Amino acid sequence: GEDTLSLHDALPIFRYGNVVGSRGSVVPFFQKLIDQGIDALPITHEEMTRFWITLQQGVDFVLDNFGRMKGGEIFVPKLPSVRITDLASAMAPNLPHKIIGIRPGEKLHEVMCPADDSYHTFEFDDFFVIGPTINFNNRNNDFSKTAAGEKGKMVEQGFEYNSQSNPDFFSIEQLQKMNQSKVAE
């Protein structure tokens, strides 16, 4: 029927950072070690950073952008970054850190808008849109404007949105407040 997808349909992609507290997240890993009475928290690299999003923020981001999508684009939220050393200090202020080295395949910083995609990346107030690299037939391929009519601005060539150069970082104090409110739930 007409309400089914075909090979000609282009769906959007939603790209976002580490979901706080999810499986594989460092938060439950650190908490388990703290609860076991470890004498130092293992840190793979003292400069490591990550983007940070809650599960609810991730769900809201996807739902909020359904009305903006044209199809084929990648939506990327603007998120705060966290230094892994700050997170460790927030969770266990009195525990030292032990640098253990980066594991195979692990990245020092997270990249959500690569520089190679800057020629088709648009910045909006709270998010970025990376337009598709292929042209879909019979579609409005101007991704500087969302389907909802919001206008974005093309980023400068070479622009990269990564967790290291992000201007928005959580402080240790903010991380402690987040952790305390999570414990209170």
Name every feature range the model reports, one short phrase each.
Residues 10-13, 155:
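Gly-rich Lys/Arg/Thr-decorated short loops/hinges at beta-loop-alpha junctions or inter-strand turns
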Residues 124-156:
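C-terminal, low-complexity/hydrophilic appendages and adjacent surface loops
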Residues 1-9:
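Single conserved hydrophobic/aromatic residue that forms the stacking wall/gate
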Residues 152-185:
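Generic C-terminus detector
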Residues 13-18, 29-53, 57, 61-80, ...:
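A conserved pocket-lining segment of Rossmann-fold NAD(P)-dependent short-chain dehydrogenase/reductase
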Residues 65-136, 173-185:
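Mid/C-terminal beta-alpha module of Rossmann-like enzyme folds, strongest
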